[in-house]
């Protein structure tokens, strides 16, 4: 084998232009090249095609290439005159398509995500019509909106921009255009654009959301009033998380999830224990008062490190929830949760992750600042550690961390 490689070493890739030039000379005049090369090309001409057919002898390539080059330079026989007005309309339509793409890509950066208005939203030139050469005079011009899902094939520029801003720059910031799969991107567009990113709830759903928000806020107020000054890492500023995690549990059960492992740090943990996993409030209050002694925790540990597990009843049936224990290293629980999920999947013979899933709850500052988060993300889709996907929820209550400002 090595001998064969040595004998054909002159055919390696870097010699391709030289061999091609020799082959062209051979086709024009076989006697003009060296005898060994002539024999090599003779054998090449006699080699049958992959389907067994014997091809007709090759002909010189240069005249054919030159003929096509000359033809490409000749003017086309058919011309289609276009007026300046048509060209301007086409240019503006292209500009409109660029605006649609810009809002899908960049709209989240201009979304209204700061209810405290601590800083102004950044100016993004790409979201302004003037960036694409459009002016106020074009605002009432009708353009094609066929590649959107706003419910109309044509819209005035004014209405189109209003719809884009409501969808992508409202109280929701949606980043999805980085996804490489066009089917998934289209799915997001079809979910967001018809309702302008404004969910529609019936009265029963609104009452349920109000009840859950009241439960979350009520617990925080009670703890603040009853146990003044005790560390509890309040959920205040992120109360809607309780509604969110409820929806995750309900939707998971509908999709056939039987177990859900949750990992989170301190912020809002006590609220999740009571309002999501169903821990008895009396047990929590006893921990605040130092009366409750857990046989599972060593002496000196704190209540907001506690884990818990329970079976929760959903509309689709029961689901087992497990909140992992977590030490004061905020995000160190992340790989523990992934490992627990994978072990439970292996135990249930669930290689695709259809019956067990993980949910990780992060603080906004910890998610960005702690390396273990990204290290855990790097385990995704690996053969030994993949779980089929994890739900990540980042709570941003605009605190970050509760130390005083040294300035």
Predicted regions and their residues:
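Subset of Sec-pathway N-terminal targeting signals
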Residues: 1-44
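Active-site-adjacent bridging/hinge elements
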Residues: 2, 214-225, 246-247, 300-318
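Hydrophobic alpha-helical scaffolding
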Residues: 9-12, 27, 85-89, 150-154, ...
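Conserved active-site and cofactor/substrate-binding residues in soluble primary-metabolism enzymes
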Residues: 17, 94, 239-243, 331, ...
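Generic, well-ordered alpha-helical scaffold segments in large soluble proteins
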Residues: 21, 25, 29, 40-43, ...
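Extended, charge-enriched "interface" segments that sit outside catalytic cores
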Residues: 44-241, 257, 294
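Active-site pocket-lining segments that scaffold enzyme catalytic pockets across diverse folds
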Residues: 222-282
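Cofactor-binding active-site loop characterized by glycine-rich and histidine/acidic residues
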Residues: 261-407
């Amino acid at each position: 084998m090595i001998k064969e490689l040595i004998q054909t070493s002159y055919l390696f890739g870097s010699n391709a232009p030289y061999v091609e030039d020799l082959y062209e000379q051979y086709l024009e005049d076989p006697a003009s090249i060296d005898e060994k090369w002539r024999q090599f090309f003779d054998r090449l001409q006699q080699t049958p095609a992959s389907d067994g057919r014997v091809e007709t002898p090759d002909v010189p390539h240069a005249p054919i290439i030159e003929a096509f080059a000359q033809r490409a330079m000749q003017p086309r026989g058919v011309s289609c005159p276009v007026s300046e007005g048509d060209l301007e309309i086409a240019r503006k339509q292209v500009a409109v398509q660029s605006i649609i793409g810009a809002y899908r890509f960049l709209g989240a950066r201009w979304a209204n995500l700061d209810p405290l208005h601590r800083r102004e939203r950044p100016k993004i030139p790409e979201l302004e019509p003037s960036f694409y050469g459009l002016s106020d005079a074009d605002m009432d011009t009708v353009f094609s909106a066929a590649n959107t899902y706003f419910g109309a094939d044509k819209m005035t520029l004014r209405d189109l921009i209003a719809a884009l801003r409501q969808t992508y720059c409202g109280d929701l910031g949606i980043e999805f255009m980085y996804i490489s799969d066009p089917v998934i991107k289209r799915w997001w567009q079809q979910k967001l654009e018809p309702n302008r990113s404004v969910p529609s709830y019936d009265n029963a759903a609104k009452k349920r959301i109000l009840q859950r928000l009241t439960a979350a806020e009520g617990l925080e107020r009670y703890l603040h009033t009853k146990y003044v000054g005790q560390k509890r890492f309040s959920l205040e500023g992120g109360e809607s998380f309780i509604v969110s995690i409820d929806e995750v549990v309900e939707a998971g059960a509908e999709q056939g999830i039987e177990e859900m492992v949750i990992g989170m740090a301190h912020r809002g943990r006590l609220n999740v224990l009571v309002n999501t996993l169903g821990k008895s409030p009396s047990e929590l209050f006893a921990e605040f008062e130092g009366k409750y002694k857990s046989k599972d925790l060593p002496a000196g540990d704190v209540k907001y490190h506690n884990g818990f597990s329970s079976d929760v009843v959903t509309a689709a049936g029961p689901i087992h929830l497990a909140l992992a224990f977590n030490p004061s290293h905020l995000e160190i629980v992340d790989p523990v949760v992934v490992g627990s999920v994978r072990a439970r999947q292996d135990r249930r013979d669930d290689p695709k992750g259809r019956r067990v899933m993980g949910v990780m709850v992060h603080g906004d500052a910890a998610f960005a600042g702690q390396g273990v988060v990204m290290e855990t993300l790097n385990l995704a889709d690996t053969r030994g550690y993949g779980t089929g996907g994890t739900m990540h929820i980042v709570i941003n209550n605009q605190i970050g961390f509760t130390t005083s400002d040294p300035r």
